[in-house]
Amino acid sequence: MQALLFLMALLLPSRAGAEEIIGGVESEPHSRPYMAYVNTFSKKGYVAICGGFLIAPQFVMTAAHCSGRRMTVTLGAHNVRKRECTQQKIKVEKYILPPNYNVSSKFNDIVLLKLKKQANLTSAVDVVPLPGPSDFAKPGTMCWAAGWGRTGVKKSISHTLREVELKIVGEKACKIFRHYKDSLQICVGSSTKVASVYMGDSGGPLLCAGVAHGIVSSGRGNAKPPAIFTRISPHVPWINRVIKGE
């Protein structure tokens, strides 16, 4: 498959499909135990699919544009079409948006999902470390993204988790987008490679040296890189306050 494709709109109904990793490979089953498969149900019964990742036993992080009135999270999954014994399906009690989330610009496209109960941490379900508030993922860094999104613009979603290696590039490459701010976002994906994220991958993590530095946020309609990821480090103080219940 090519690279990770982004979920570009707000929420896509399941009948429309959701996109996945482009230019990547199928992940080794349960090798990324922090990954979460997020389902958001609309008032009309449509289901939007996003990625997410476990940052504390009772909290999953995903993109703000993936949030909705009724949500469930599946942890410990590799093939989401199967009932794997490792899976834990938990309803979302509530979602917490940052005070400065901007719907139109997608700045601060991050949300915390508080689960109705704590996840049972196992070899297939575990938390991922976050960066420090001053940690700044820099251009040239090689990172990994993963998700269940489409493998191509005209292809269906993937039932198994896929991953792709992506390079952080300079902010100049993301000037093609109407809204981009390097202090809040990360520009990811080289134009010389057929690798990126797309619909259905939204909300998934960007891991650099084992640390979650970004969240799949938005990209181009043709699925060509670069793509925009929300930068996590500026939100770490807020994240810590939410987890502590402050």
UniProtKB/Swiss-Prot annotation:
SUPFAM superfamilies: Trypsin-like serine proteases
Residue positions of the active site: H65, D109, S202
Record keyword Signal present: yes
Tissues/organs with expression: Selectively expressed in uterine mast cells.
GO biological process: proteolysis
Origin superkingdom: Eukaryota
Pfam families attached to this UniProt entry: Trypsin
Keywords associated with the record: Disulfide bond, Hydrolase, Protease, Serine protease, Signal, Zymogen
Residue span, Peptidase S1 domain: 21-244
Entry's EC annotation: 3.4.21.-
Signal peptide: 1-18
Disulfide bonding pattern of the chain: C50-C66, C143-C208, C174-C187
Molecular-function GO terms, alphabetical: serine-type endopeptidase activity
Propeptide segments, given as residue ranges: 19-20
PANTHER family xref list: CHYMASE 2, MAST CELL-RELATED (PTHR24271:SF23), KALLIKREIN-RELATED (PTHR24271)
Family from the record: Belongs to the peptidase S1 family. Granzyme subfamily.
Protein name in UniProt: Mast cell protease 9
